Structures are given as structure tokens and as C-alpha cells.
Amino acid sequence: MSEVKINETENNFTLATAISNAVERAETGDNFMTEIVYNSFENTDKAQSAVYNAMMGGTCKPGDIIGEEVEIIGITITTGQCNTIFGDTSENPEKIIKPCVTFFLSDGRTVSTLSNGLVRAVKLMFACDNIPTEDAPFKCTFEQRTGKNGVFHTLKAL
């Protein structure tokens, strides 16, 4: 597993490296680790508290802002290890901890979600080099779609 690089002049995490690591851990089920990805957030106690509070529960849910045009200025990803509970599998099935994505919006709201559709949308966003910052926000709408397994959320770029 590669390490997160720190830009020593600004004391900020390199966003692309941190995201790559988080996605790799989400896909492989590597050890539990939370990374706070700083792009334009300052590395201060106040900024760290804001990120922590957002990751503990966003100010709104994806379903609350369906169809609304928003600007994403930052993203954090928290990943977990896939754990198997030993014993009778009928009573103790394999438990998987899903990655949590937190979106920071330009209007100050935060959206935290475990949605597979939004995790997939973030992977595609980064694959297309759309890395949101305050200077270059990712303009999109949150959408709700129906698939073969029911309703899911995703992002539509504007």
C-alpha cells in the first residue's frame, strides 16, 4: 500500500495520492484507516473539527438535495476493513464495512453517505480528473435512479 504524501510547504495532503489510497483500500478491504483529504482546507484545529463533524454526519442527506444544482469543493473518504465473524455462518454472516463519502458543498453544507452509487460516481469523477477544489468546484446535481436492485443515488455533472 502506498503512503499519503504531504506537501511540506503547505502542510496539506496531496489530494490525488490520498484519493488513490482510499479507493485502493475500499476495493481491497485493507486495514481500517480514515484519511482526511485536504485540498483547500487549512490544516488548523478549526478546519479539522469541521471535517470531523462533517464525517460524523453531514448536514443533509443525498435525498434532501435531489435535482438541486450544487458545487462540490471537497471530498473525504473513510474506508473500513472487511471482517469475517467466526462461527456458524447462518447466525454470524460475513460483515463488510462500506466506505463513507463526505461531500463539502460551496454553500457550507456537507453530505455524508454510504451509497454505492455515489461511491462509484466519485471513482468515476477522479478517473476523469475531476478533482473538486474551492477554486475549481465540481458542479453537479444529486440524482435518484431506479436499477434492477431498487433505488440508488448518483451524480450528474453539469
Language model regions located:
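Acidic, glycine-rich flexible loop segments
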Residues: 101-130
